[in-house]
């Protein structure tokens, strides 16, 4: 067994970052930009590539306004047209693929027709797999110019293997999200220790990591950056917006949006190998306001870290407080 697992396990609510001396007059001076692949984005945040979180219209808006996105893979026949549409608009294309045999034909088609997405994500629940490694090598052979993210994984060994196979970034997180019940159905996952898993993986990583799942508050973004994330993928916090694809539902005068996991019965259309669930999340208005709030909160985090950009957060001290950060707030 790896000695990484002798480390103390902790999650977002167990950690507080320790402030340093502030060197900027206003948080507006703090730069939240992050380089990911060949592009620089406004903040290190990306909506989850789930059908209940992102659709084509939202992908267009995000790309137009300087945010990273990953389009989901649940309408595979539309992906090539999506890439062409984004390129016709002068925008970058970012798609998801799986590992089924038909996906190899799809990659061949993209290569043959020279329809090259700037970003590709291999989206598999258990990404530490021979079949994922095979797909990484195939995509890098056929589409060498695409920036390839692979996942999801939970261990340093998985990071090393996927990076060595050719992945340009790795997605960390097995079942910590609100709509995922992998930990309950299988007994496996990073639920309850997602932040510690990110820390372990960052010690092995030579390339960017995406922290995927378990984000409940904006401050968790800064904590993810502290423990090694270049990007933070978020589902439930983005699912309740006007632009979100889920249906708007009113119950007792309160508005909600539908949100479901990618391995849920809703997504699969059958009760078979279900590791996700459906839920309602409070309606939150426009996603523009949430993204602006996330950026402002992250600017405040940078000011507390004693720096001018995200690099300051990566080196701050932290304390483990064992879920006491909400004491006095309830």
Curated annotation (Swiss-Prot):
Keyword Oxidoreductase recorded: yes
Any one GO biological process: purine nucleotide metabolic process
InterPro entries noted in UniProt: Aldolase_TIM, GMP_reductase, GuaC_type_2, IMP_DH/GMP_Rdtase_CS, IMP_DH_GMPRt
Coiled coil ranges: none
GO (cellular component) term, any one: GMP reductase complex
Ribosomal protein recorded as keyword: no
Lineage top rank: taxon: Bacteria
Keyword entries, A-Z: NADP, Oxidoreductase
Physiological role: Catalyzes the irreversible NADPH-dependent deamination of GMP to IMP. It functions in the conversion of nucleobase, nucleoside and nucleotide derivatives of G to A nucleotides, and in maintaining the intracellular balance of A and G nucleotides.
Protein name: GMP reductase
């Amino acid at each position: 067994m790896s000695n990484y697992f002798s480390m103390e396990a902790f999650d977002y609510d167990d950690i507080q970052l320790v402030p340093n001396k502030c060197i900027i007059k206003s948080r507006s001076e703090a730069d939240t930009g992050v380089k990911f692949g060949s592009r620089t984005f406004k903040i290190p945040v990306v909506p989850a590539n789930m059908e209940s979180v992102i659709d084509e219209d939202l992908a267009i808006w995000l790309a137009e306004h300087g945010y990273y996105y990953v389009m989901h893979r649940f309408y595979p026949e539309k992906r090539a047209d999506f890439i062409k549409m984004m390129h016709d608009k002068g925008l970058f294309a970012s798609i998801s693929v799986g590992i089924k045999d038909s996906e190899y034909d799809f990659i061949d088609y993209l290569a043959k027709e020279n329809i090259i997405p700037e970003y590709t994500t291999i989206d598999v629940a258990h990404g530490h797999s021979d079949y994922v490694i095979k797909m990484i090598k195939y995509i890098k052979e056929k589409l060498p110019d695409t920036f390839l993210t692979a996942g999801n994984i939970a261990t340093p060994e998985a990071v090393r293997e996927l990076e060595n196979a050719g992945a340009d970034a790795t997605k960390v997180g097995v079942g910590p999200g609100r709509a995922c019940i992998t930990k309950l159905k299988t007994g496996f996952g990073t639920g309850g220790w997602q932040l510690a898993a990110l820390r372990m993986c960052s010690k092995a990583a030579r390339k960017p990591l995406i922290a995927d799942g378990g984000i409940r508050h904006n401050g968790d973004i800064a904590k993810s950056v502290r423990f090694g994330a270049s990007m933070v993928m978020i589902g439930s916090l983005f699912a309740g917006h006007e632009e979100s694809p889920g249906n708007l539902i009113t119950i007792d005068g309160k508005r909600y949006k539908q949100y479901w996991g990618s391995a849920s019965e809703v997504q699969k259309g059958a009760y078979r190998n279900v590791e996700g669930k459906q839920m309602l999340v409070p309606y939150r208005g426009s996603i523009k306001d949430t993204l602006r709030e996330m950026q402002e909160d992250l600017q405040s985090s940078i000011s507390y870290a004693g720096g001018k950009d995200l690099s300051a957060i990566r080196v701050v001290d932290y304390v483990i407080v064992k879920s006491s950060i909400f004491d006095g707030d309830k």
